[in-house]
């Protein structure tokens, strides 16, 4: 069971049963409690859970409100045939999130939120994921379209799958209403799923403009999304403007900021390109001074710590940390915020 720090303890009434409650209830619990949450990656196939559990143990000191478990579509590999041509095959390098989510929740007593994505999945496969999660008593999920395959220029839906997050939401809503994807009634419907979605303070890379991007977020809220968590960002001003514009068009769900400390020198150029996020000028100036991984790590810790402090000062009580390749940095930021 995770250790509880006084300044970050959840309301006792909530904490007793938070493994089986709507995450948005935790996010809107009131009282000024500061909530951390963390996102982790399933282990590579064949490597076991020891390293993952060791990582989670490092975060348990901060009494996380919940832990997200990512999922990724299969990757393409090329196999040479006898005739000299190449065949493109899908290979899955990491297990799905269902078993990992159950193992984390049972071992650590922390609410878990597995990701369910359109990418690489059929509607039937998603339906079985929902059934498995319901059997395990996991009621919170994050619904995402997922990234395009590495070799594809644009997102290509899996045959029999979904093209958009809204299609995935429709399937989950039908399941919640007591129907399988083919319209067959579920004889013994279980508890309904609560779900969150993603949002983008600097616009999704495929959105025509910010207004259209916000329109789709509003649509997801109206379809039933309980909260949204942002893509990582380094400029709080963009987050505040995004939230302001969202509220102006009637988006009322919690918008949780996603923070990822820079942890090594290569990330100073890779992160803005891969995640389509800008460095504010102050960060860019300091980034150019970094000569080593340690320089970049220290800058990342200091910048993210100050980001979080500004968010707290502005009344944001829930912060979500992206931990991949930044576990120790995230832990240090969280420690400084206690």
List the predicted regions and their residue ranges.
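Glycine-rich, positively charged N-terminal anion/phosphate-binding segment
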Residues: 20-28, 50-57, 61-65, 69-108
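Conserved, mostly hydrophobic/aromatic
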Residues: 39, 67, 133, 220, ...
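Flexible, glycine-rich active-site loops centered on histidine and acidic residues
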Residues: 123-170
């Amino acid at each position: 069971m995770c250790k509880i720090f006084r300044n970050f303890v959840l309301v006792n009434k909530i904490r007793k049963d938070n493994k089986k409650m709507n995450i948005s209830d935790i996010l809107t619990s009131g009282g000024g409690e500061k909530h951390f949450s963390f996102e982790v990656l399933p282990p590579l196939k064949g490597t076991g859970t020891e390293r993952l559990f060791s990582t989670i143990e490092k975060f348990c000191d901060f009494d996380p409100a919940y832990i997200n478990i990512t999922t990724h579509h299969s990757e393409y590999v090329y196999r040479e045939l006898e005739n000299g041509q190449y065949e493109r095959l899908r290979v899955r390098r990491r297990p799905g999130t269902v078993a990992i989510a159950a193992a984390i929740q049972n071992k650590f007593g922390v609410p878990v939120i597995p990701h369910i994505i359109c990418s690489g999945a059929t509607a039937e496969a998603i339906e079985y994921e929902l059934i498995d999660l319901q059997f395990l008593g996991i009621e919170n999920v994050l619904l995402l379209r997922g990234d395009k395959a590495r070799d594809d220029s644009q997102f290509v839906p899996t045959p029999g799958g979904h093209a958009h997050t809204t299609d995935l939401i429709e399937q989950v809503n039908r399941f919640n209403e007591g129907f399988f994807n083919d319209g067959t009634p579920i004889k013994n419907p279980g508890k309904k799923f609560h779900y969150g979605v993603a949002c983008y303070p600097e616009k999704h890379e495929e959105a025509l403009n910010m207004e259209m991007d916000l329109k789709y977020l509003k649509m997801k809220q109206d379809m039933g999304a309980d909260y949204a968590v942002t893509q990582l960002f380094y400029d709080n001003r963009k987050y505040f403007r995004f939230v302001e514009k969202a509220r102006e068009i009637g988006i009322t769900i919690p918008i949780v900021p996603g923070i990822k400390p820079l942890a090594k020198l290569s990330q100073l150029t890779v992160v803005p390109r891969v995640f389509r996020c800008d460095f504010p000028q102050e960060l860019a100036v300091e980034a150019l001074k970094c000569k080593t991984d340690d320089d970049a790590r220290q800058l990342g810790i200091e910048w993210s710590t100050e980001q979080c402090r500004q968010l707290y000062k502005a009344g944001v009580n829930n912060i979500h940390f992206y931990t991949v390749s930044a576990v120790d940095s995230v832990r240090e930021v969280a420690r400084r915020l206690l």
